[in-house]
């Protein structure tokens, strides 16, 4: 293996030299460590499971990545040197496909979570498409819906790549860039940071110089792999130091703060990362009765908690350091640090905290001195580039092997952030004291840092203006951050000019709630909202609000009278409009809410108060989600459910609606797949399997209208399946009219459901209703039950198993011949299928042999209903969606399109519209095809004007 030696010296201090062995690339690093003894491991936990992790050796990672790389090259046909966007929300997929992309000789780009604001999300995706030069994109089926409503980037779900049986792709030298990371930009667009192999390896060697680690210990990470602290500071550094690494989802640690300490003890963790806001929460947790005593002596392996991303309050962190010392950690366990995406995470560390900072009376901790590989200088604020003496605040600039050389495909950003002599301008204000310790003193430009994340106040202001909130005057909104005395983290303030009278408490409350909701949906920050008079919000001659002056006035207390008046008016509003719980569920939810929201905010909270009205943070929102899931006890609640039902009453109604769908005592065909949106709903009719789960992937992409599925009768105990086709149509027609009394209507049916949807449309039109959209998915009008019977029983039974994931595709192929005989009994078929099914998956679904047999019987009953049915009559119009014919049809694509699907023209009073779609009959809505299908489907829906 090729290696090289490099000498580093510690800049700005007495020179000490150390010889560090570097690999030529990250791939060579992984290859070497994977073959090294003793074996080290990657330990990953999942959401809801903090006790039984999945464990992979570094050799497992390498071998799986080589197979996955083969899928990228030979199935996805990536071009060497191109960018592959990786959009995941779990650690293992992020790591696996990061390495697979490198092995495939491509450039991985670590996608950050998308904004909940649709406009912001679309702008971001368009920007990525342009900047990354139309990248390929990998994601999971559960995240595919986040790409809805745009055509800039088309994702592929990794579940469809099926790489396990592929041969290994050999490792070879690739390009200089190892990974692309994203960071915020002043314009609101992210900047793309290319980290090279040489740059990352220099960073890893510098960290190794700074952090000698004990043998047989691990490193712990709880942030996403899209963050440089996770990817470089923990994942790659653990490989470099031949250490175990432990990864756990963020929500688990934030929901149960002391789990952080449990994991440190359980896995002998010696090094981890935590920003200031989390350390403040940890201090509060350890201050509770008996909590500290529980961990006495349990943290003896812990050497370093690196803390960066936001300022560390010396008093707060010192208190925590003393507590951790009682638990067995070293006295200087907390290491305040400075780092950026552009420096491969931490590069300047204070290993003398807290002693140095306490002795020198620093209110915020110093970030210390440089590791090998980076140098700093402080230059005058006037921009002339001259250095300033120790103790003088100036602009912080950096250079060295660990610092990027320029942004990806962004020469303007590169030019603006580098000096003429190639020093990188960080945008931070700082000074170096007489001992060479770096102390940060704020930001050169407007910036908000909350919970370790960096936000542009301009983005928040723009989102509020774009929301057209009735209670404020556009253009007079100002957002800034402040560090209140004795606080542990920054607070976001939003001031605005109201257009209501001061006595209008209803408008005041509604406006504040709307502003907080927009801020949360856009960037996930907590906000204090304050209305001011126009005299307090004067604009410059260029029409701009002076954010700096407004912030200074707020911090001086110039707005104190406005704050007091606002608090009084809001308290009055809550007093006269307080609403009590009206059900046991609302009472239970109220308990969860009040335990999650800070105590000083719970007094005025009621069942009609928006959580955004209380300024709930994104972290508290995740904790609230977990608390409600624990309360209801049946699976996860999508985060968007909480965000779109932000009061106890609306959330209670939403939960009850879902619970009713699980109530087997009353048959109701209507299943709410998506409840939001103001456009007319879309009704989706099941295929011959009778279940609407198949539409779940599609429903994720439809956000502007409710999505209702129609589920067959017969799944639950005591339910008789339908007996006739006419009974199906009349039942569904009545349910549609009850839920949506008037049109225009939008209906679509898949396969068998296409015939049902067609007759429902006829029934609606017969009663004078308008059916503006009728979608017919991959079924010709001429195909009847007799023709379907030969394939439907075995095909649909296997499709059920495939759809719910109890049998993989290779298993389907294996047992298919055993289901060939025409006289095979249902019981024998069920036994054959159950013998091949994944036992664990069956248990997860609660799918027993009897339940599967009931499902098969329902399918058979639905078949009987259509045996003698023939399509007749006509509707105003229709959209027919079709893929290539099944092999069992033994016809050409052209015959299928013209002689079968094309026959719908005989049953429409205007020419039908035909749409060819990807996939096979049973996979058009699967993960690998849903993204392309939903674009075609939603375009057709919109083209019909509904």
Curated annotation (Swiss-Prot):
Q: Which Gene3D superfamilies match?
A: 3.30.300.30, ACP-like (1.10.1200.10), alpha/beta hydrolase (3.40.50.1820), N-terminal domain of ligase-like (3.40.50.12780)
Stated role: Nonribosomal peptide synthetase that mediates the biosynthesis of phenguignardic acid. PngA alone is sufficient for phenguignardic acid synthesis. PngA first activates phenylpyruvic acid (PPA) through its A domain to AMP-PPA. The PPA unit is then loaded to the T domain and eventually transferred to the TE domain. Another PPA unit is then loaded onto the T domain. The TE domain likely promotes the enolate formation on the attached unit, followed by a nucleophilic attack on the carbonyl to yield an ether linkage between the two units.
The record's annotation in PROSITE patterns points to:
CARRIER
Region (Adenylation (A) domain) residue spans: 32-450
Q: Which family does the UniProt entry place this protein in? A: Belongs to the NRP synthetase family.
List UniProt keywords, sorted A-Z.
Answer: Ligase, Phosphopantetheine, Phosphoprotein
Q: Does the keyword Ligase apply?
A: yes
Record keywords: Phosphoprotein included? yes
The record places domain Carrier at: 580-659
PANTHER family reported in the protein's UniProt record = LONG-CHAIN-FATTY-ACID--COA LIGASE, MALONATE--COA LIGASE ACSF3, MITOCHONDRIAL
Instruction: Give the originating organism.
Output: Aspergillus terreus (strain NIH 2624 / FGSC A1156)
Name the segments for region: Thioesterase (TE) domain.
Answer: 681-933
**Could you tell me what reaction this enzyme catalyses?**
2 3-phenylpyruvate + H(+) = phenguignardate + H2O
Q: What is this protein called?
A: Nonribosomal peptide synthetase pngA
Principal EC category: ligase
């Amino acid at each position: 293996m090729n290696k090289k030696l490099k000498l580093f010296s510690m800049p700005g201090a007495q020179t000490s030299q150390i010889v560090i062995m570097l690999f030529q690339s990250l791939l060579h690093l992984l290859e070497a460590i994977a073959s090294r003894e003793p074996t080290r491991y990657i330990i990953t936990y999942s959401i809801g499971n903090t006790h039984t992790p999945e464990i992979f050796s570094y050799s497992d990672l390498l071998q799986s990545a080589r197979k996955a790389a083969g899928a990228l090259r030979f199935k996805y046909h990536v071009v060497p040197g191109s960018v592959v966007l990786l959009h995941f929300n779990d650690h293992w997929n992020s790591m696996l496909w990061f390495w697979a992309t490198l092995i495939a000789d491509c450039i991985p780009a670590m996608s950050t979570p998308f904004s909940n604001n649709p406009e912001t999300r679309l702008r971001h995706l368009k920007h990525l498409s342009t900047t990354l030069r139309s990248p390929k994109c990998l994601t999971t089926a559960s995240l595919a819906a986040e790409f809805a409503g745009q055509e800039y980037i088309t994702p592929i779900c990794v579940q469809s790549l099926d790489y396990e049986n592929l041969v290994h792709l050999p490792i070879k030298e690739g390009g200089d860039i190892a990974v692309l990371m994203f960071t915020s930009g002043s314009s609101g667009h992210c900047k793309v940071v290319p980290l090279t192999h040489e740059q990352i390896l220099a960073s890893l060697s510098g960290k190794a110089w700074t952090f000698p680690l004990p043998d047989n210990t691990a490193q712990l990470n709880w942030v996403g792999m899209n963050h440089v602290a996770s990817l470089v500071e923990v994942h790659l550094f653990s490989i470099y130091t031949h250490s175990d690494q432990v990864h756990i989802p963020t929500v688990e640690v934030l929901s149960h703060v002391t789990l952080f300490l449990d994991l440190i003890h359980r896995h002998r963790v010696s090094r981890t990362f935590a920003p200031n806001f989390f350390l403040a929460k940890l201090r509060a947790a350890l201050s509770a009765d008996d909590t500290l005593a529980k961990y006495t002596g349990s943290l003896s392996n812990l050497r370093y908690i690196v803390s960066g991303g936001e300022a560390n309050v010396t008093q707060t962190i010192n208190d925590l350091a003393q507590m951790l010392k009682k638990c067995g950690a070293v006295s200087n366990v907390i290491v305040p640090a400075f780092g950026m995406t552009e420096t491969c995470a931490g590069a300047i560390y204070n290993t003398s905290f807290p002693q140095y900072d306490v002795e020198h009376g620093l209110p915020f901790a110093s970030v210390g001195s440089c590791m090998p590989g980076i140098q700093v200088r402080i230059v005058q604020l006037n921009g002339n580039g001259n250095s300033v003496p120790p103790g003088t605040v100036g602009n912080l600039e950096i250079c060295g092997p660990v610092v990027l050389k320029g942004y990806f495909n962004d020469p303007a950003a590169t030019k603006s952030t580098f000096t003429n002599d190639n020093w990188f301008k960080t945008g931070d204000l700082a000074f170096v004291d007489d001992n060479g310790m770096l102390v940060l003193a704020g930001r050169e430009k407007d910036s908000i840092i909350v919970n370790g994340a960096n936000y542009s106040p301009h983005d928040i202001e723009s989102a509020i203006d774009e929301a057209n909130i009735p209670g404020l005057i556009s253009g007079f909104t100002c957002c800034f951050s402040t560090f209140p005395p004795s606080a542990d983290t920054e607070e976001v303030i939003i001031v605005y000019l109201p257009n209501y009278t001061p006595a209008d408490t209803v408008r005041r409350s509604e406006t504040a709630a709307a502003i907080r909701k927009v801020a949360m949906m856009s960037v996930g920050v907590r906000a204090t909202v304050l209305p001011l008079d126009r005299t307090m919000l004067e604009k410059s001659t260029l029409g701009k609000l002076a954010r700096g002056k407004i912030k200074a006035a707020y911090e001086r207390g110039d707005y104190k009278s406005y704050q007091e008046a606002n608090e009084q008016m809001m308290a009055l509003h809550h007093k006269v409009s307080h609403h009590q719980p009206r059900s046991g569920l609302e009472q239970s939810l109220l308990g969860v809410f009040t335990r999650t929201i800070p105590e000083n905010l719970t007094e005025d909270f009621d069942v009609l108060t928006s959580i955004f009205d209380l300024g709930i943070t994104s972290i508290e929102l995740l904790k609230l989600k977990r608390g409600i899931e624990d309360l209801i006890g049946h699976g996860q609640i999508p985060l968007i459910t909480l965000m779109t039902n932000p009061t106890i009453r609306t959330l209670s109604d939403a939960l009850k609606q879902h619970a009713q769908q699980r109530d087997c005592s009353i048959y109701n065909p209507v299943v709410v797949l998506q409840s939001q949106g103001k456009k007319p709903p879309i009704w989706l009719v099941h295929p011959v399997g009778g279940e609407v789960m198949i539409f779940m992937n599609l429903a994720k992409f439809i956000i502007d209208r409710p999505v209702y599925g129609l589920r067959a009768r017969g799944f639950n105990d005591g339910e008789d399946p339908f007996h006739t086709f006419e009974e199906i149509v009349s039942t569904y027609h009545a349910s549609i009219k009850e839920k949506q009394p008037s049109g225009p209507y939008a209906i679509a049916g898949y396969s068998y459901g296409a015939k049902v949807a067609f007759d429902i449309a006829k029934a609606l039109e017969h009663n004078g209703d308008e059916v503006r959209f009728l979608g017919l998915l991959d079924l010709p009008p001429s195909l009847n039950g007799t023709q379907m019977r030969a394939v439907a029983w075995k095909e649909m039974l296997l499709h059920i198993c495939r759809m719910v994931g109890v049998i993989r595709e290779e298993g389907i192929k294996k047992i298919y011949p055993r289901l060939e005989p025409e006289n095979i009994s249902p019981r024998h078929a069920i036994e054959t299928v159950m013998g091949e099914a994944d036992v664990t998956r069956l248990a997860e679904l609660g799918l027993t042999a009897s339940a599967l047999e009931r499902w098969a019987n329902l399918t058979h009953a639905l078949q009987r209903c259509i045996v003698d049915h023939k399509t007749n009559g006509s509707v105003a119009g229709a959209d027919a969606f079709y893929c290539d014919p099944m092999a069992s049809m033994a016809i050409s694509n052209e015959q299928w399109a013209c002689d079968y699907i094309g026959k719908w023209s005989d049953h429409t009073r205007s020419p039908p519209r035909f749409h060819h779609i990807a996939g096979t009959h049973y996979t058009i809505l699967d993960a690998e095809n849903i993204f392309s299908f939903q674009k075609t489907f939603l375009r057709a829906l919109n083209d019909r004007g509904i």
